[in-house]
Design a protein with these regions (language model features):
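N-terminal acidic leader/helix
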Residues: 1-29
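Short, charge-rich amphipathic interface segments used for partner binding and complex assembly
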Residues: 21-60
Length: 60
């Protein structure tokens, strides 16, 4: 499991996982869009071999 800490978030958008088929097989992606307090936009893309690996737990 990988942990990503994001601080000073103004807006957080977590998309549902989507599957993609490539020449090497099926894989899953999930995008996270973050806008911080200074209006800086960051896009994070996660890749995995199965949908369960892309589970996200929000800690508040």
């Amino acid at each position: 499991m990988t942990t990503i800490l994001i601080h000073r978030v103004k807006t957080l958008v977590i998309q549902k996982p989507t599957s993609l088929e490539s020449t090497v097989g099926l894989f899953w992606t999930r995008k996270i869009f973050v806008i911080d307090e200074n209006s800086k936009k960051t896009e994070i893309t996660l890749f995995a071999e199965n949908e369960q690996t892309l589970e996200i737990k929000e800690l508040t």
